[in-house]
Amino acid sequence: MSLTREQLAQQIVDAGRFLYGRGWSPATSSNYSTRLSPSEALLTVSGKHKGQLGLDDVLATDLSGNSLEPGKKPSAETLLHTQLYSWRPEIGAVLHTHSVNATVLSRLTPQDFIEFEDYELQKAFSGVSTHESRVRVPIFDNDQDIARLAAKVQPWLEAHPDCVGYLIRGHGLYTWGAQMSDALRQIEAFEFLFECELKTRSVMNRQG
């Protein structure tokens, strides 16, 4: 049974309160979305505090990122959300967060990816059934030109259909799922892994 627009908007509001409460979406940073229809998405409007969202703080867009609601301004990063809905029709929710761990780890990693292996919590990601796997998370350099950034992301997505998320350097994390609960689960898993990685590097640096 399909959810109504109001139910989907409430999911976004609830996600904002949860993610703000965990410190992963401070102030007016971050943006969230759900799929509204095969050709439409419901996204947070620009400039709103994510811990204080209301049902009117979302708007519908087409999959080219154009607002379908006059008077409401979509986030500058809308295209990165709609790109994912166009890429895989089974994606039902996309979350973009600005946590300290994601920001710092992406800045400290000189490579264009980070890889996680042998962590039990990798099984929290869709399609991963064992810790004996590798989860590679690409890191793209930040770019204020979102269309140009999306053009860099697209080839990775096409070459890695099992991708579960990506980082923007010094900026934050994008992840997604079939529904909002899946995307939220993956946010938590990523944050756990990011913290483990940072602590591991800290210990190794002290030992070195």
UniProtKB/Swiss-Prot annotation:
Pfam families the record matches: Aldolase_II
Keyword Zinc: yes
GO molecular function annotation: methylthioribulose 1-phosphate dehydratase activity; zinc ion binding
Gene Ontology biological process: L-methionine salvage from methylthioadenosine; monosaccharide metabolic process
Keywords: Amino-acid biosynthesis, Lyase, Metal-binding, Methionine biosynthesis, Zinc
Textual note on the cofactor: Binds 1 zinc ion per subunit.
CC terms in the record's Gene Ontology section: cytoplasm
Name assigned to this protein: Methylthioribulose-1-phosphate dehydratase
Gene: mtnB
